[in-house]
Amino acid sequence: MSSSPFTNLGNLDTEAIYENKENEYQTNITNETSNVQNLSSGNDDQQYPNSTNDDANNGLTASQAKLQDIAAVTLFQDNNISTTTLAPPSPSPLRLNEAPRRRGRPRKYPPKPIDEGSEPIIKRKRGRPPKIKSSSPSTKLDDPLKPKRGRGRPRLHPLPVVQPSVDEGTTQNNLQMGLDEPNIIEGFAEGHANLSELKPKRGRGRPRKIKPEEGSSSQNGLSPLVVLPAKRGRGRPPLHRSEQKIANTPISNNVTVESTGTNLHTHSQLNPENEQSSSEFYSLNPQSEIRKEVVVTDQPLFSTADVPVKRKRGRPPLNKPKILFGTSTENKIDENRPKRGRGRPRLERPSGLPLDSKSQSLFKRKRGRPPKIASGIVPLSAFTRKHEDMLHDSDALSLKHFAITSPNNQQFLNNQQRESAPLLPRKRGRPPKKRQENAEIRNITPGLTDSSVHSSSATPQSESSSPNSVSPLLPSSDRLPLLRQSQFTPPPKKPNFEVAIISPKKSQHKLYPNPVVESVFNDVPYSEIDSQLHTIKSTIAARLCGKSHIPLVGHMDEQTKLYQWVRQTIVLGEGNSVIIVGPRGSGKSVLVDDILSRAAQEINEKSYVVRLNGTYQTDDKLALREISRQLSIELESIESDEALKSEMNFSDTLTKLLATLSHPVDLGIAEDVMTTSAAVIFVLEEFDLFVQHSRQMLLYNLFDIAQSRKAPILIIGLTTRYDCSESLEKRVKSRFSHMVIPMRPPSSLSEFEQILKSVLYVSDEGGKDQIITCWNQRVDELLSDTRSHLHKLVQHHYFASRNLKLLYVDLLFPILSMAPDRPLLADEDFANISLKVSDHKVELVKNLSLLELALLICAVRFEARDIPACNFNSAYQEYRQLHQSSVINAAASGALAHSSRLWGRDVALEAWETLGSIGLIIPVHPSTNVSGALSRQCQLWQPEVDINVVSVGLREHRRLPSHYYRWLKEVI
């Protein structure tokens, strides 16, 4: 049998053996772990150099063989220990009681040994520690008078300790019987098992006020406990709240409590010996600041000791009787006194006046206006010689002559004692005017006439001679009462002595024709006057409507430049292009018409004029069709129509149309270089709209023909935009001649009137026609007079817009309304210009919403800046800028809020299309098909109304913000 290290361990302690075994086991594990780490690092062959071939044959490495050896040694040692003959050691109680090791951080301190007699310690849980419950029977019961400690914040002021008091007689009896006071209290606590119910459980929050229980202290001769005030409820406190708490009284005592006001009276029917004890029986609250007096009286009263009910909110009911405790004769209410009602307080009746029906009617307050107090005015018939002294002293007039109240007419006549004051009640309405001191005084008798009044006032007479007359010796003092008429004479509507003051009217200036001029028409027959008047009316109406030429006034430099370029084109065959820029009404079209008419008279060469308008020719195809139509009329041929119908491109079609007008040398017709073909002058009105055409094909071909030697043409563009030349494409701009003529509007009122004279004047070739001469003189007379209505009308248009076309519209109706019986202009015809039929566009403008009106103002602002067309995007951007500037101005002026809001883009787009549907704005390209939101926003529109129509609509608009006027005035 092989020797083992565990064979001679019989005398050793088993615990030491197990400890040594555990230490060796831990040491071996540590060493083997380090060896395994060394083997993994590559030192297996050095530590096991003599590895057998069997291991190699089995496919095991040196490290794996070493691990097998360690496992075999460990298994062998365990088998030896388990098969030893030694008795197994008894397990240690420390190991048996030790709880299994859990995962986590190792224990810092080993567990303490547990005593055999002690109870196992329960593991402490999180949260509030549990209360320790003691099971010892020696624990005494808690004091029932001590409240239970509750949760929450500790009480700020501890409750007072209640000590029951014992009467003196009871104490002496207890002492004689050998009982002391603590035993009595202990017996009292044992006899009252439910005494703890007096102290409610202490709850969370604010400490509860303790309320006494009924009948808890009325026995055993104990005095009542100290009573704390009741818990203060929420809301408004009651109107009359007694702050004194009274304990229940014994049944044998008759107690009456009278609660009147703020005092508390207690009446008790007690013996004198018990008065002191009864007064001590009621204890006051020590915490109350104000204590009420307790008055004890011996007078017995018949009442009960009811506690007053808590007063409810609101007005007390009317049908509920008033409860009085301890009533007496002094507090009795008069039953005859009427019930107090709502409204104005009742007028008190004097004490000395008897209460009868007459006095009640006298002092009863009625509804409505109070009655008029009787006036001290005395009729004239009551005055005699003996009353003259009384008139000088107002104090001598006693009130006994006048009525106390205002009776009706029948009572007034039946009262014989008040004949001296026959006055009627004051009527409603405006009081009569104060009569003058020196005014004539009429007699109240119906028999007196106006003549007698004048005679009596002029010559004084005695009373006997004229009893019905007025005494002239009446005093002129201010204290003299005014006289009134009696009930028999109706009052006059207006006194004769009152004079109506009327301010004189200003003489209206009227301009009548000169009588010398009128005498001329007397010698002329009616038929001749009618024919001459018809000629004058047709000539001036054609000028006002733009159908005939108007003579140009001023602009001499502009006329010289344009005439020179026209002459070079017609005579020398040069091609040029020029743009005339200026605001509306400045005379651009008049300048072109004047130069063309002058060239037609002075130049013998043949030329043609083609007029195009960007408002009507919205695309190049329509413009080409209009050119072909006008040239075919001028040339009287059909080649233009055939060329238009052929399938050719735009440039070839335009070249073929102008082929007949090309240079003769190019066509091979003539060999003379000085010979030229007929010139063509293109007048393009609204030139900026042609610039907006796609690719600008029309302008490119016209400028290209003008720069080349194909045909002598002159392109004259009329526009209101000063930046129109900058909008040209690069290829079009390179072929433009860059010649611009600016035009300015009339700069003075005299120049404005001079232009109007040139329109209203009718030319007389020989000066032999007297009717035309009188017409021109009448025009000069009306325009030169500053008081005439025609001159005022011209001033209005000059300072408002300086637009002659608007003035022409106002002059058209008075001129066409002339007749042969009145062949000259009348100034009254121009005074009723404001009474003409209102424009329907003004009605449309004043019925617009605020958003629609704002967008229309933005479109008009663009037109005032010489931008006749705009789209929705530009109008909405202008609207946003105006709104932001208004908000900034309002904030700078100290306003808290702005009066209008900024509308969104979608809502504004609908409002913009509404303006187009009602005709206030019209599209520039009506023939194009608009589709999609982007096309709707980018489509060009131009306003159909001018700034004057919008300003009139703003004045008639209701509830319009002030900044809308400012937006419009910024461009005027």
Curated annotation (Swiss-Prot):
Subunit structure: ORC is composed of six subunits. ORC interacts with cdc18, recruiting it to the ars1 origin of replication.
This protein's encoding gene: orc4
Gene3D superfamilies xrefs: P-loop containing nucleotide triphosphate hydrolases
Organism this protein belongs to: Schizosaccharomyces pombe (strain 972 / ATCC 24843) (Fission yeast)
Phosphothreonine carried by residues: T405
Taxonomic placement: Eukaryota, Fungi, Dikarya, Ascomycota, Taphrinomycotina
Region (Disordered): 31-59, 82-172, 193-223, 310-374, 408-477
Protein's name according to its UniProt entry: Origin recognition complex subunit 4
GO MF annotation: an example: ATP binding
Role description: Component of the origin recognition complex (ORC) that binds origins of replication. It has a role in both chromosomal replication and mating type transcriptional silencing. ORC binds to multiple sites within the ars1 origin of DNA replication in an ATP-independent manner. This binding is mediated by the N-terminal A.T hook repeats of orc4.
